[in-house]
């Protein structure tokens, strides 16, 4: 793709998200979602092949359906309240439909089926945008309508997402699918706390984006897309392999790494609101995520595969720019927990 055209498309994606996050008019929010959706499709098809075409089509159909539900919710709210403003409380029916639309855009269960398939069908760089930047706009809408969200519906989808995210990743060997199921589980944690403390949900989103970005950049350095290719990494880049071990354990939520911080805070906040059973179920189901990440780190870093000269040639083609950007990302992805006492300021 022409670099100038790619830059324009990328700017359009950012502009669409910025419109959704800053507007106070429902129609402008819908327009922002449409701009974002239409601009991201060429990015998903950057490497043109049948798999990327299929992934882009699945993404388009899912997002178009979600946009239709969003417009339906806007029209219902207009019928009852006569207001286009996002600052006014939503009608209960409109709130439920809008929650379902945002769940579809985020990939929450039971609307999660498109996430692994689309992520697997695109390049690593496109998958990074899909699993990080594309979560910002729907989360900002959920943040704005959080006072009127149906708590039971949101908690049901959250618990289902955590279960599906852990269960679906158990038998995967494709790294992009593993990260997609991990994304579904993380979205479940974020939406679970959205009604109780929306600010904490945004903090959780920021840490999730940081961890996922670090993981994708590491995989792009090595051009690894399967667990088998990742298992040969120790012979070429032992330091980077050690870093991948800690980042993946952080994504799984193992203390004292950064990924444990949001889970700890969410469980603490939910117990403060006299909710005991839900956080217990969520914590137990997260062990599934931790299990497949520990299995991945074992095969990557704790076992030595036979080394051949052909395997060692690949280091010459590493992207030096990506490697230079990894140091601050790795530090932040593993050492946020010591700063967590400062998070008391959120209360």
Curated annotation (Swiss-Prot):
Subcellular location(s) per record: Mitochondrion inner membrane
Keyword Transferase included in the entry's annotation: no
First-level EC class: translocase
GO cellular component terms given for this protein: mitochondrial inner membrane
One MF annotation (Gene Ontology) recorded for this entry: NADH dehydrogenase (ubiquinone) activity
Reactions that this protein is recorded to catalyse: a ubiquinone + NADH + 5 H(+)(in) = a ubiquinol + NAD(+) + 4 H(+)(out)
GO biological process: mitochondrial electron transport, NADH to ubiquinone; mitochondrial respiratory chain complex I assembly
Keywords on record: Electron transport, Membrane, Mitochondrion, Mitochondrion inner membrane, NAD, Respiratory chain, Translocase, Transmembrane, Transmembrane helix, Transport, Ubiquinone
Record-linked InterPro entries: Complex_I_Subunit_2, NADH_DH_su2_C, NADH_UbQ_OxRdtase_chain2, ND/Mrp_TM
Stretches that traverse the bilayer: 3-23, 25-45, 59-79, 96-116, 122-142, 149-169, 178-198, 201-221, 237-257, 274-294, 326-346
Main localisation: mitochondrion
One Pfam family of this chain: Proton_antipo_M
EC number: 7.1.1.2
Keyword Protein biosynthesis: no
Membrane topology of this protein: Multi-pass membrane protein
Self-association and partners: Core subunit of respiratory chain NADH dehydrogenase (Complex I) which is composed of 45 different subunits. Interacts with TMEM242.
Family indicated by similarity: Belongs to the complex I subunit 2 family.
Listed PANTHER family: NADH-UBIQUINONE OXIDOREDUCTASE CHAIN 2
Cited function: Core subunit of the mitochondrial membrane respiratory chain NADH dehydrogenase (Complex I) which catalyzes electron transfer from NADH through the respiratory chain, using ubiquinone as an electron acceptor. Essential for the catalytic activity and assembly of complex I.
Protein name: NADH-ubiquinone oxidoreductase chain 2
Organism listed in the record: Nyctimene aello
Gene name as annotated: MT-ND2
